[in-house]
Amino acid sequence: MSENQTEKLVRTLSGRVVSDKMDKTVTVLVERKVKHPLIGKVVRRSNKFHAHDENNECKEGDLVMIEESRPLSKTKTWRVSKIVEKARIV
């Protein structure tokens, strides 16, 4: 008999860090483009997610990938999986 191993698909999103003031937590702004149902114009919609950053590696302005995880607190159910691009220092 072969054992069937089913991997659960993990939701991943890409966004920009807008706040890193909390300990081990970052706020990530995720933007998406949707077509307005009545007007037909493409509109930007955004959501903010609190994500767990174990080593406090993320800084404000970084582009990160976040993945869904178990609830870590009242508002935190996402985890930073990788930093795609570091913010440019001006």
UniProtKB/Swiss-Prot annotation:
Which InterPro entries does the record match to this protein?
NA-bd_OB-fold, Ribosomal_uS17, Ribosomal_uS17_bact/chlr, Ribosomal_uS17_CS
Keywords of the record, alphabetical order, are: Ribonucleoprotein, Ribosomal protein, RNA-binding, rRNA-binding
Bilayer-crossing regions: none
Give the record's GO CC terms.
cytosolic small ribosomal subunit
Please give one Gene Ontology molecular function term for this protein: rRNA binding
Q: What CDD domains does the database record attribute to this sequence?
A: Ribosomal_uS17
Give the GO biological process terms. Answer: translation
Q: Does the keyword Protease apply?
A: no
Q: Which family does it belong to?
A: Belongs to the universal ribosomal protein uS17 family.
Q: What does this protein do?
A: One of the primary rRNA binding proteins, it binds specifically to the 5'-end of 16S ribosomal RNA.
Q: How does it assemble?
A: Part of the 30S ribosomal subunit.
Q: State the HAMAP family in the record.
A: Ribosomal_uS17_B
UniProt protein name: Small ribosomal subunit protein uS17
What organism, scientifically named, is this protein from? Methylobacillus flagellatus (strain ATCC 51484 / DSM 6875 / VKM B-1610 / KT)
Gene (UniProt): rpsQ
